[in-house]
Curated annotation (Swiss-Prot):
GO terms for molecular function: FAD binding; UDP-N-acetylmuramate dehydrogenase activity. Belongs to the MurB family. The active site is at 170, 220 (proton donor), 290. Its cofactor is FAD. GO terms for cellular component: cytosol. This is UDP-N-acetylenolpyruvoylglucosamine reductase. Cell wall formation. GO terms for biological process: cell division; cell wall organization; peptidoglycan biosynthetic process; regulation of cell shape. The gene is murB. It catalyses: UDP-N-acetyl-alpha-D-muramate + NADP(+) = UDP-N-acetyl-3-O-(1-carboxyvinyl)-alpha-D-glucosamine + NADPH + H(+). Keywords: Cell cycle, Cell division, Cell shape, Cell wall biogenesis/degradation, Cytoplasm, FAD, Flavoprotein, NADP, Oxidoreductase, Peptidoglycan synthesis.
């Protein structure tokens, strides 16, 4: 820790930082070393230093589709929340990794650019969205993603073109190669602002009516199994409302697990395992987690 602070006195570095402050579930242990770079250059410095000194490094985005275990995370956490610039270039939008997806969709609306309406309610960061090819209501990030600037795990800066950014359902080249997203370029289309707003209002209303936004949660917990819907399988298994500790299968949407009061990451993990086992026994279907789970028990 002292070496890191001496090496980078210009960068915000905290010791034993509670990660529950940075996750939507309000759960998770502490980070040994918590770093918040203010620029691409600072991010590259930290990543290169950790690689050269064999220090474990984990990147944290908006913490919205994430469970951090109660034992926390060893090594260095790099939180990219300060990299939030969003700008327009012709009919393209360039957003930095820490920018919120919702804010980027609103920025596009303000510029009369269509294509990100589906993202108007997704509570993730640009970096996290690219990592998992986030999507909702028939749209995915890969539909509009033109290019991305990334860091390799050893700190090399790379520009990836659309053809290099292979993506599938909740999968991307970025995740496969463990790249760190620095910014993303989206190709959009000019459209009447009122038409864009109407579509966003429609999707927001649908989201509010179906999802348990009144409780802390990690968003959609499970991927959609082929030929099924995870929420329907969970509901038909009689698990809607099931509670372990402070974690509950949402009464509003069975595909969500909410924190109804002082839940721990262990509560979440135990409830996820119980749901998977029950659905497997009843329907012979494997539920694969969409939520990313990291850290130590």
């Amino acid at each position: 820790m002292n070496n890191l602070q001496k090496q980078f006195p210009h960068i915000s570095i905290k010791l034993n930082e509670p990660l529950s402050k940075y996750t939507y579930t309000k759960t998770g242990g502490n980070a040994d070393i918590f770093v918040m770079p203010k620029s691409i250059e600072e991010t590259q410095e930290i990543v290169s230093y950790c690689y050269q000194n064999t220090i474990p490094l984990t990147v944290l985005g908006n913490g919205s589709n994430l469970i951090i275990k109660d034992g926390g995370i060893r090594g260095v956490i790099v939180h990219l929340d300060l990299l939030q610039t969003i700008e327009r270039k012709n009919t393209q939008i360039i957003a930095m990794s820490g920018a919120k997806l919702i804010d980027t969709a609103k920025f596009a609306l303000g510029e009369s650019l269509s294509g990100l309406e589906f993202a108007c309610g997704i509570p993730g960061s640009i970096g996290g969205a690219l990592h998992m090819n986030a999507g909702a209501y028939g749209g995915e990030i890969s539909d509009v993603l033109e290019a991305a600037t990334v860091l390799t795990p050893y700190g090399e800066l790379k520009k990836l073109k659309r053809s290099e950014l292979k993506a599938a359902y909740r999968f991307s080249t970025i995740a496969e190669k463990n790249y760190i997203v620095l910014d993303a370029t989206f190709s959009l289309e000019l459209e009447d602002k009122n038409i864009i707003q109407a579509k966003m209002d429609e999707l927001t209303a649908a989201r509010e009516s179906k999802q348990p936004l009144e409780y802390p949660s990690c968003g959609s917990v499970f991927k959609r199994p082929p030929g099924h819907f995870a929420g329907k399988l969970i509901q038909d298994s009689g698990l809607q409302g099931h509670i372990i500790g402070g974690a509950q299968v949402s009464l509003k949407h069975a595909g969500f697990i909410v924190n109804i009061g002082n839940a721990t990451a262990t509560d979440y993990m135990n409830l996820i395992a119980h749901v998977q086992q029950t659905v497997r026994e009843k329907f012979d279907v494997e539920l694969e987690t969409e939520v990313k789970i990291i850290g130590e028990d």
